């Protein structure tokens, strides 16, 4: 009977003035880092914690049941209200590949909801120091509907979890940070909170050093050595031409 008069379309305030939503992200892996397209695809678990004032019960009245798993799919049977958190800087349809997993509801009304899935964000890559470059990619999350007078968006302690992160072959996650922002948009008079997660990526240059830089330097050095060959030797010109052709072929392969 908890869901008899329950509406998943209304803020479940109960005795609260506004919903306090804690957020966190567990990074599992970076599936794709596309520097040409300017996108970063990540496998994540998007975590939410809040209190639903309309889902509180006395366990003694329900066979000592203290928690239950409930549906979060919009329009589903016994579906509960869930926060509409979107990735603002998405590179595709917002949150399309995040699963509407079941949420854990406790008898005191507190809810834990973890959404596994794939997100694709935009990222501006600065390749001036390639291949010894460091990139900074943001993930900006926030509610699409609720402003700061309706939802108190907060950072969970340890909001970024990388304990189960699978390292990328070409990149290293060097650092990460999170920041809570309040932004006033031209459409609306209220402030809208968002949480921006900043990920710092360091390129692993070993492959490029071994396969590009070292051969290029070696070939260029041979060109200098050609000047040590006696000028009246017929092999000097043929040696220089051979080195030049080798360098051209190498550059064609790289392109």
Model regions and ranges:
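Aromatic-anchored segments of alpha-helical transmembrane domains
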Residues: 247-253
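Winged helix-turn-helix DNA-binding recognition segment
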Residues: 244
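Non-transmembrane, solvent-exposed beta-strand/loop segments in proteins
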Residues: 1-241, 253-255
């Amino acid at each position: 009977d908890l869901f008899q008069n329950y509406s998943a379309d209304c803020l479940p305030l109960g005795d609260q003035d506004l919903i306090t939503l804690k957020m966190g992200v567990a990074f599992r892996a970076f599936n794709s880092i596309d520097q040409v397209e300017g996108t970063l695809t990540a496998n994540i678990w998007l975590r939410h914690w809040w209190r639903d004032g309309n889902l509180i019960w006395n366990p003694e009245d329900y066979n000592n049941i203290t928690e239950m798993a409930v549906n979060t799919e919009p329009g589903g049977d016994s579906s509960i209200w869930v926060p509409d958190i979107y990735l603002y800087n998405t590179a595709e349809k917002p949150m399309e590949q995040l699963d509407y997993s079941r949420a854990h509801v406790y008898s005191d009304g507190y809810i834990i909801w973890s959404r596994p899935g794939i997100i694709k964000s935009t990222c501006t890559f600065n390749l001036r120091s390639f291949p010894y470059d460091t990139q900074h990619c943001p993930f900006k999350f926030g509610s699409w509907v609720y402003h700061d007078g309706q939802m108190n968006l907060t950072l969970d302690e340890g909001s970024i979890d990388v304990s189960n992160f699978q390292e990328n072959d070409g990149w290293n996650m060097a650092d990460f940070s999170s920041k809570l922002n309040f932004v006033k948009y031209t459409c609306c008079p209220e402030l809208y909170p968002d949480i921006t997660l900043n990920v710092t990526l360091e390129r692993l240059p070993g492959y490029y050093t071994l396969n590009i830089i070292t051969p290029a330097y070696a070939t260029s050095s041979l060109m200098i050595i050609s000047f040590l060959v006696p000028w009246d030797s017929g092999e000097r010109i043929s040696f220089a031409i051979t080195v030049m052709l080798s360098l051209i072929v190498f550059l064609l392969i790289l392109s």
